[in-house]
Amino acid sequence: MAGVCLKRSAHIIFGVGSSLLIGIFMPLTYSFILIISGVLGSLFPDLDLRYRHRILLHNILMLIISSMLTGFLLLYLGFSRIFSAYFSAGFFMGYMSHLMGDLLTYRGVALLYPFSRKMFKIPIGSSESTLVNLLGYLIGILFIAIYIFSKIRS
């Protein structure tokens, strides 16, 4: 759906960078978990593209519920507590970065749904805007660089 959401690649880079920020405080061995979960979390909110987009999955309640359910599902499937916790945390950060990216568009997001349908926004451009997408890329790359330098220094 053209014109409705940021480019997937911008969401992914921003999501991976955001999830790796919490990796600064974790052993390097968990980086791959954070990258995968950051990608999945950054894409998950757009599952509502065909039904109530930017409302149903673009809110704080679903951010919390889906992140918790992800962790519980992994535990149920037999993954370790540490793996489940790190995956859930990375998913949360990726998801949150998606909401932040869409917050920068003219349309905004319904952060408080189902309690309110008010669309919150810090409008700097459309979802197709080069500026908005470039900002997603740059912030994501900055976060990835911070992560890499933190691991080099330790």
Predicted regions and their residues:
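N-terminal membrane-targeting hydrophobic helices
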Residues: M1-S154
